Regions:
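Conserved donor-binding/catalytic core segment of Leloir-type glycosyltransferases
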Residues: 185-204, 210-214
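Carbohydrate-associated surface elements
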Residues: 44, 153, 172
Length: 366
């Protein structure tokens, strides 16, 4: 496979952690390790520590987007920086993530000409900015030669709302990083439960987990990862934001990963990371989580509870803790499931899309 020059555009600020940002950086590093030249553009302050292959696009603003608050960058300077990034890069392919986002992604799509690939992460959008941008977007989206959706939900939303027919390629995980710290399930020790997410964001569902914990008679250790203000809670260790290495270490020593999210999820990358680390995954019955856990199969990779129902979550946790054999079956299935999302496999699928759209020309910006 000949070496490619690849430009990747991220709409969300690297100043704050997020699934799309992590996906972009991981994909870039994977392709660099395979001998390709990769550059990334996205919002980021000068003080934010990032790899040298990232062009920092400057400050961003918090904007309500997709049921959450995203830090985006827009305005004349965004278009100027996107144009400079493209013309300087001489890329064989430009990979734009979330081209619907009013940030560097939308700007890059507007100015770019040539082989363009887009990845859609979101499965719904209630952004007022997007509603205003839809007439403009539909014309611009015709420039995309290869579309990718990270989940069936994201693919379906894109088809219904904006047209096109992206192919399904999931998010990737470096499974080996999480397998390194894997420990046997609890046996003669107190089981550990882990939650990861922004603590003060209602849709992440931390309050549901805390209410469920109040109903547990079994002794458990609970570790909560994530930034934001947190309530006082007995037997809960709030560790704040952690590095990727620390996250892998915590998941590796843990026994159960709980994802009580209320909605706004199109995939669930941390579920895959937890599976790779050997955790039992307990998640709300969102469509995205059900798909990741392969919940309808004879050997599911995780167990679901009714969305928003702390009583059902408590009952589910009780069942897992009291039945280690059942927990081990979920771990075994989850470990195999996680391998399907390994970056080695995912990057090959993405590269096939690149090879399909490339025609020997260079991406330019008008």
């Amino acid at each position: 496979m000949p070496s490619m020059r690849i430009g990747i555009v991220c709409p969300y600020s690297f100043d704050a952690p997020g699934g799309v940002q992590a996906h972009v950086l991981d994909l870039a590093e994977k392709f660099i390790s395979q001998g390709h030249h990769v550059e990334v553009l996205g919002p980021a302050s000068e003080s934010t520590q990032l790899p040298d292959f990232v062009t920092k696009g400057g400050a961003s603003l918090p904007i309500p987007y997709n049921g959450s608050v995203a830090r985006l960058s827009f305005g004349p300077s965004t278009f100027i920086r996107a144009r400079d990034f493209i013309n300087r890069g001489q890329f064989d392919v430009l990979h734009i993530h979330e081209p619907n986002s009013p940030s560097f992604s939308m700007a890059a799509l507007k100015v770019a000409r040539g082989p363009i690939v887009a990845t859609y992460h979101a499965s719904s959008n209630r952004s007022l900015a997007l509603k205003f941008a839809l007439p403009f977007l539909r014309g611009q989206l015709e420039k995309i030669r290869g579309g990718i959706a990270v989940s069936e939900m994201a693919r379906r939303w894109q088809v219904q709302m904006l047209g096109g027919d992206p192919i399904l390629i999931p998010n990737g995980v470096e499974t080996a990083q999480f397998e390194l710290n894997k420990k046997p399930l609890w046996s003669g020790r107190i089981p550990e439960i882990v939650f990861l997410g922004r603590l003060d964001e209602h849709r992440k569902g931390l309050d549901i987990l805390l209410r469920a914990l109040d109903q547990l008679d079994q002794e458990v250790r609970v570790t909560v990862i994530g930034g934001g203000n947190h309530p006082l809670a007995p037997r809960v260790d709030f560790v704040g934001r952690v590095s990727d290495e620390e996250k892998a270490e915590i998941l590796g020593r843990a026994d159960i990963y709980v994802a009580p999210n209320r909605g706004g999820e199109s995939f669930g990358i941390v579920l895959v990371e937890a599976m790779a680390a050997g955790c039992v995954v307990v998640a709300s019955d969102l469509e995205a989580f059900s798909a990741v856990c392969d919940a309808q199969s004879p050997e599911p990779s995780g167990i679901l509870f009714r969305n928003g129902d702390a009583d059902d979550l408590a009952s589910t946790l009780r069942n897992v803790i009291e039945n280690p054999k059942f927990g081990q079956e979920l771990v075994t299935s989850g470990t195999q499931r996680a391998k399907e999302f390994d970056w080695d496999n995912v990057s090959k699928e993405i590269m096939r899309v690149y090879e399909t759209v490339c025609d020997g020309t260079t991406v330019t910006a008008a």
